[in-house]
């Protein structure tokens, strides 16, 4: 009888931990990266806002620029890449190098204009 209770309590504890872990995981972590691009509610205003960005606050543009930095970090796995890429509201050499490396040439001008819109 005590063995049954012990197994039962371990099973309940495991289920409780699974429930807590699944409820605290962000929706973006469970979905592919492209799935969250169209949903504005996946990013809060505070998570996208950078005080150095004094231009137009456009979530879609900020998300697109941030994605370049995230992808660049995933390729190079250097800790400073993600932060340096976003510094000065994406108007820096690291962002330009990431853009050159990751994006097709026909998208470069579009991203340069986005940096100008959200930047200074």
Swiss-Prot record:
MF terms (GO), sorted A to Z: neuropeptide hormone activity
Output the Gene Ontology cellular-component terms. Answer: extracellular region
Q: List the disulfide bonds.
A: 53-89, 69-85, 72-98
Location of the protein in the cell:
Secreted
Gene3D superfamilies the UniProt entry points to: Crustacean CHH/MIH/GIH neurohormone (1.10.2010.10)
Example GO biological process: neuropeptide signaling pathway
The primary location reported for this protein is secreted
The family database entries (InterPro entries) matched by this protein are listed as:
Crust_neurhormone_CS, Crust_neurohorm, Crust_neurohorm_sf, Hyperglycemic, Hyperglycemic1
Which Pfam family name is an example for this entry?
Crust_neurohorm
Which range is the signal sequence, renumbered to this chain? Answer: 1-27
* Modification Valine amide occurs at: 118
Q: Which UniProt keywords apply?
A: Amidation, Carbohydrate metabolism, Cleavage on pair of basic residues, Disulfide bond, Glucose metabolism, Hormone, Neuropeptide, Secreted, Signal
**Protein family membership:** Belongs to the arthropod CHH/MIH/GIH/VIH hormone family.
Question: What is the role of this chain?
Answer: Hormone found in the sinus gland of isopods and decapods which controls the blood sugar level. Has a secretagogue action over the amylase released from the midgut gland. May act as a stress hormone and may be involved in the control of molting and reproduction.
Output this protein's name: Crustacean hyperglycemic hormones 1
> What organism, scientifically named, is this protein from?
Penaeus monodon (Giant tiger prawn)
């Amino acid at each position: 009888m005590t063995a049954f209770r012990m197994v039962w309590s371990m099973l309940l504890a495991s289920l409780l931990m699974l429930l807590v872990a699944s409820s605290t995981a962000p929706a973006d972590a469970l979905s592919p990266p492209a799935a969250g691009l169209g949903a504005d509610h996946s990013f809060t205003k505070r998570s996208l806002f950078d005080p150095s960005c004094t231009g137009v606050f456009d979530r879609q543009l900020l998300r697109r620029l941030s994605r370049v930095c995230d992808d660049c970090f995933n390729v190079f796995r250097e800790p400073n890449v993600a932060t340096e890429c976003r510094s000065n509201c994406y108007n820096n050499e690291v962002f330009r190098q990431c853009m050159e490396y990751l994006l097709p040439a026909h998208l470069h001008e579009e991203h340069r204009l986005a940096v100008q819109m959200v930047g200074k």
